[in-house]
Amino acid sequence: MRHILVTFAMCFLAISAYPGTYVETFDDGDFGDLDIYNYGGGISEWKVEDGILICRRPVSMTSTLLYGEENWGNYSIECDARIVEPIANLYSIGLDLRVSNIDNASSINDVWCLAGNQGVVYIWAWLNGNSAVQSPQKAFHLQLNRWYHLKAIANENEFEFYIDGELMASLSDSRFPSGRVGLAVTGSVSHLDNVVITGDDVPDNNVETAVSSSGKLATTWGQLRRQ
């Protein structure tokens, strides 16, 4: 986990402001017993080194590390992410919303929020294993080795994707009422850190795990000291 320059008081208020807030900083060297879904098959490698989650996905299809349950409704997810090394022709980082039916590729549903080397940011929804709808695209030049703060929101039929606090894409669709949530990597070696998930269905984890003895905040609120 990288340092975040805020006070303990700000940390506590930010985390306790929601009835359900899950924080993951990877400081324990593990990402737990989570499902990994590789869209289109192929391989991916997810591991934790030095308090940072690392994904290696060598093909131009997305690999997603999934949190939560399929009955999760409204929530937000945010994290810090950067692409360190492109591997495939198409590469991206992003977040995955309302993911369901991963046991059957022909019936999987999800809403991707992606930024990559295509020069645009967009939300792309898939229904029953097929492309269903895509948001208007917004121009965006993704820089390698630069940390970005990603945030995605699923609220009723509305989906929003933010990068560094700026709304980059939005989509309205009623066909994705609930589902799991995840971190998405395509065609690259990418780093991810400081995951925060909030929502009515999201279980709290211990606030004390979000703050080290030195008072460093382990979520993405506050000003990051970019490396």
Name the predicted role of every residue range.
Residues 6-16:
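Bacterial N-terminal signal peptides
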Residues 18-226:
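Extracellular glycan-recognition regions
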Residues 1-5:
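Positively charged n-region of N-terminal signal peptides that target proteins for export
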